Amino acid sequence: MSTASGEVATLPAAPTPAFMATNLLVCSMLWSTSFLFIKLSGSINPFVLASIRGLIGASALALWFVVQAKSFRPDNGQWHHWVVLGALNGWIPNVLVAHALTQIGTAPAAMIQASGPLLVAVLSHLLYADERLTPRRFVGVVIGLAGMGILIGPTALPDSGISPWGALTMVATALSYAAANLYVRSIRHADPARLALGQQICSGIPATTLALVVAGPSAFAAVPGSAASLLALGIVSTALPILLFMRLIRRAGPTRASMVGYLQPVWTTIMAVLFLGESIGLRELTGGVVVLTGVALVSFSGRVKAIR
């Protein structure tokens, strides 16, 4: 996966089924723990939480670079890629998720975020000639959007007990991740590990700046009380899965890599029930199943294409 500074990363022609299965399972499980650790972090300001998450994630990846004796410098001066990914795949969704989880449960939030592959498929159809929507994928998108309607629709009803802002915030989160997935595809000859490091650096620094401006230094006083959860959030839920995910996108393309979103709500729901004591209603379960059915049709059709 990694190369020395200045070298061009050499990638296999296509990912093997074993590579896909292993990386999808591990990456989705690790990423799913983020919902759990955010909930366990208590009432920390979303900007502060995004700040600490980004800084810890960057520190963990930087330590990995030191151990590997790798250079921190961007490939071919690609600082702009770091900044874009730090926003789209870093501090923006981190803030949005932290805010949304103060409004809705972890399982519904993960199910809404699972719409990411649907957004990736539609945007890929518009942007890339080799990612056109086949009839099967089109049906999958329609089914997935119907599932989103089941999940989000009741927020428009009075006394529904469901936060419309929480649901819409998770939709915005899915859109941000989808845009990041597509942007990664446009990056050529970059080391995925270095992209992951740059993303976290350019996620933690802006989030810290915004936290100081929006919430003030006093908002960081709550951090020591949730140190264990935040440390796990930065390493287990951020540094490790983003490293795997960058590699997955470069090997399998944005549409196949976004299948992580297909598995994430399953892990999140299990964790929410086991560790947070949340209950899943029939509407959430039905909507989630419909969304994932659409995602499956979108993601498991056609052949896997390598990204060179």
Where are these regions (language model features)?
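Hydrophobic transmembrane alpha-helices of multi-pass small-molecule transport proteins
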Residues: 61, 83, 122-123, 135-155, ...
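Specific transmembrane alpha-helical segments of multi-pass solute transporters/efflux pumps
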Residues: 30, 34-35, 62-113, 149-150, ...
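Structural signature of hydrophobic alpha-helical transmembrane segments
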Residues: 45-57, 99-117, 162-175, 224-238, ...
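Glycine-/small-residue-enriched transmembrane alpha-helix faces in small-molecule transporters
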Residues: 2-51, 87, 95, 99, ...
